Amino acid sequence: MSSSAIQVAKTATYLPDLVEVQRASFKWFLDEGLIEELDSFSPITDYTGKLELHFVGNEYRLKRPRHDVEEAKRRDATFASQMYVTCRLVNKETGEIKEQEVFIGELPLMTERGTFIINGAERVIVNQIVRSPGVYFKDEQDKNGRRTYNASVIPNRGAWLKFETDKNDLLHVRVDKTRKINAHVLMRAMGLSDNDVIDKLRHPEYYKKSIEAANEEGISSEDQALLELYKKLRPGEPPSVSGGQQLLQTRFFDPKRYDLGRVGRYKINKKLRLTIPDTVRTLTHEDVLSTLDYLINLELDVGGASLDDIDHLGNRRVRSVGELLQNQVRVGLNRLERIIKERMTVGETDSLTPAQLVNPKPLVAAVKEFFGSSQLSQFMDQTNPLAELTHKRRISALGPGGLTRERAGFAVRDIHPSHYGRLCPIETPEGPNAGLINSLATHARVNQYGFIETPFWKVENGRLIKEGDPIYLSADLEDECRVAPGDVATDADGQILAELIPVRYRQDFEKVPPEQVDYVQLSPVQVISVATSLIPFLEHDDANRALMGSNMQRQAVPLLRPERPLVGTGLETQVARDSGMVPISRVNGMVTFVDATAIIVRDEDGVDHTHYLQKYQRSNQDTCLNQRPIVCQGDPVIVGQVLADGSACEGGEIALGQNVLVAYMPWEGYNYEDAILVSERLVKDDLYTSVHIEKYEIEARQTKLGPEEITREIPNVAEESLGNLDEMGIIRIGAFVESGDILVGKVTPKGESDQPPEEKLLRAIFGEKARDVRDNSLRVPSTERGRVVDVRIYTREQGDELPPGANMVARVYVAQRRKIQVGDKMAGRHGNKGIISRILPREDMPFLPDGTPVDIVLNPLGVPSRMNVGQVFECLMGWAAANLDCRVKVVPFDEMYGAEKSQQTVEAYLKEAAKQPGKEWVYNPENPGKLQLIDGRSGEPFDQPVTVGYAQILKLVHLVDDKIHARSTGPYSLVTQQPLGGKAQQGGQRLGEMEVWALEAYGAAYTLQELLTVKSDDMQGRNEALNAIVKGKPIPRPGTPESFKVLMRELQSLGLDIAVYTDEGKEVDLMQDVNPRRSTPSRPTYESLGVADYDED
């Protein structure tokens, strides 16, 4: 297929760097965030005030990491750098200054791709969206339906302050949700006189009631106010004026305890129209008075005061890696401060050095805890390049300091008008996290304050100005402007053509003449996220299905031979490039060497730059990472040019699936309920074959009885089973293994106790010690097979870090090629998913008039009710493109080029394709878009014409091989003695309440009885049944299920006298062991507890 790509809809879409949000944030942390923390935390003085320790924050340095990225992955190490900072210890009494560079901990570094390597695994720090610090005004209804207003001052860290009005027109204040205090008490405690307050208010008459109320309570001076404040905030403690003063000081005016942050100061200044410099991060008297004034104006409905919408993106901000890491460093430094103060007190003042005072452990622990176990530090989704990119651009409302799933209501999850161009309205998970986890829109960026901005072109007097850089606006600023959508029609000069333009203004829609338009959106794609922007004809799909389409593209398995889509949207190249999966040239120059493992580019100065390629590496999701060069020796290259394709890429574009010939028609019921009928060609030609790499690991540990040994000498194993093992007992690379084969031979010493009787007998007769080791080898699990592609051995001698108690760790990587098969899940890009129900020989598939058999048959009933008609457009556009031998890029939302534009474009292309010689049958004017298909089995044409075309269909990661599972006998749960659940536990299928009802409805009493006893948790019964089946005897009657005994014990533990009786009223002791061969009962019975004697009385 020729690679000429036709751009159907021309819009200038220059996407920004898509991983910028991660990289910029980490750079900020290194340049500013870390220094800020080190500075804020020094000096540290001891309790006597003699010693001071200063950290010189801007003189910190990072050492070169011990391992590079690849080495860190291979050794299971962390890609991190050591932090050193200059410290000065000042002795106030002698004036002596000791200066020294001190190691304060290790800092994991971000890779070029925006990820972190922690213990050899690639992780991503997800961005968190939280409520911005600032002041918020809300209204509430009290019990009598009267509206009251309140104002909350929310800091970045520290106590919340909440002012409230009530039905008696009094003002109250709460500190951190404690009891209400008269607002004027707080004013007096802060040292403000009545006149100070009244002068600042525009409507002081409302406030005077609160002054009178305070006077009536007998609080007229600052001291009395401080006592009252202390009583309310610390009830039960003896109040004192100095205590009150200290409490107020530490709660709101101490920078270490209370911090509005740069953002909080900015928001408060903006809301209350103040001009306090942004270095003042604590509360000021002016803040409190202005808040009161605003609240009174709200209550009286004057002065243009307005309520805040907490779901507005102007009031929510994004915390990226840098800030989350900074918070964590602060936690570590606070712990360190305590340790330093203790050491200053304990140590000899004269001989102390900074290095003795500073212990790196608390900081290391805090950072490690964040990267290892924080909710926001996630194992990277590496299924394909798109999944990786989307993961880095994810924005979560969960996590520390955020919401919880249970508490989040509908309003938080809902789409808000301010999301426009900032958060994608479509891409979010289905299920409990819907709306709490979002994705950044394509053009959005996060500004210095953490608010999301989106770009616009300026409009002056109805003329669109596209010179220079677009203007980025945050949600707050955008509300004040009239913004037209990106698909307005303009003439060549940029003059807007329509007489009335729909614009968004203050979260509403109105129509205005072009002269009143302030800005125009940059591109139609800027509203949606990266994954959604890859869906062609998106505007014809229902949002629910587009959501599924976006999510399923992230689950597409990279195929053996990727093929880029015939119908794309023009963003495929950038997605592949920014995902970090494809190597990019760093210089302008010439390719001097290419092979499968490396590409060397010589720049204009004659310097060689080597790009090493990944070959068959295992991704986090067990898919295969492999890079193939696409440049040849002697090719000139420019900076930023793609040199090689990664997994799921072709020609530098993302290629998640295959373009296959699809027909929408029923076929013998095989595509009932979304099932999919596919041709054998997809299996034979390896169209949907993918490579999966599994990792198997075993460690040889030190046991009480001696060390475990990795060896070829395994007891009771035939020589042919050891054929592929080397002299150490480890499988050779390249061997083909099936389930049950030995990968690594290991023997464990066994003690006297775990020897079977026959072995004891042998030893008694011959006196020889049978080799007292047990086979504990690593074997291939059931249902798995494949070829060994890599073996890695880690020992302490080589300098590898091993888990405690382990002497050696061996890892074997096994690759398997998985062809498509019945039970695999496939999907299109429009949320049309299904399971393969049958693979037909190609001669039985319906075929086209020119004899080409169809590849996939989909059910036409899957389209109308789900309203994802985009798939039909894609399929027909693909059909035209395949016949014209080209590829097409369709930008979504094409109505700016005219009404019904998609339909016209597709039809025009189909007509164009039919003009080619011998291709007249491609377009049938009577049934546009449909063809007469012929039944492959009978050779007869079908009754009706059928929609046929090329669509991109993906194979998803939910493969039947990983899901299919059966159990005969296996492990049981300890308490209930029922079989475990799940494939990993070798579990059974649960026969639940509803299944029991079904059997009851049929009266299948015996079937039901054995399902609930012998096949489940009647311990003695199941052993006897197994015995009877093996010996061919009749199966004995079942006994009592163990879970019934557990229920009885639980009721007895509540103090209820519950027991089981026969018809004659005689008590049956279920707990007694019925097996006569074991004389000792397994559990204490009623008799042994002496209950029997008690009953006879």
Curated annotation (Swiss-Prot):
Its EC number is 2.7.7.6. GO terms for biological process: DNA-templated transcription. One of its GO terms (cellular component) is DNA-directed RNA polymerase complex. One of its GO terms (molecular function) is DNA binding. NCBIfam families: PRK00405.1 (NF001616), rpoB (TIGR02013). In cyanobacteria the RNAP catalytic core is composed of 2 alpha, 1 beta, 1 beta', 1 gamma and 1 omega subunit. When a sigma factor is associated with the core the holoenzyme is formed, which can initiate transcription. Belongs to the RNA polymerase beta chain family. Keywords: DNA-directed RNA polymerase, Nucleotidyltransferase, Transcription, Transferase. Disulfide bonds: none annotated. SUPFAM superfamilies: beta and beta-prime subunits of DNA dependent RNA-polymerase. It comes from Prochlorococcus marinus (strain MIT 9303). This is DNA-directed RNA polymerase subunit beta. It catalyses: RNA(n) + a ribonucleoside 5'-triphosphate = RNA(n+1) + diphosphate. Residues 1072-1097 are annotated as: Disordered. DNA-dependent RNA polymerase catalyzes the transcription of DNA into RNA using the four ribonucleoside triphosphates as substrates. PANTHER family: DNA-DIRECTED RNA POLYMERASE I SUBUNIT 2. InterPro entries: DNA-dir_RNA_pol_bsu_ext_1_sf, DNA-dir_RNA_pol_bsu_external_1, DNA-dir_RNA_pol_su2, DNA-dir_RNAP_su2_dom, DNA-dir_RNAP_su2_hyb_sf, RNA_pol_bsu_bac, RNA_pol_bsu_CS, RNA_pol_bsu_protrusion.
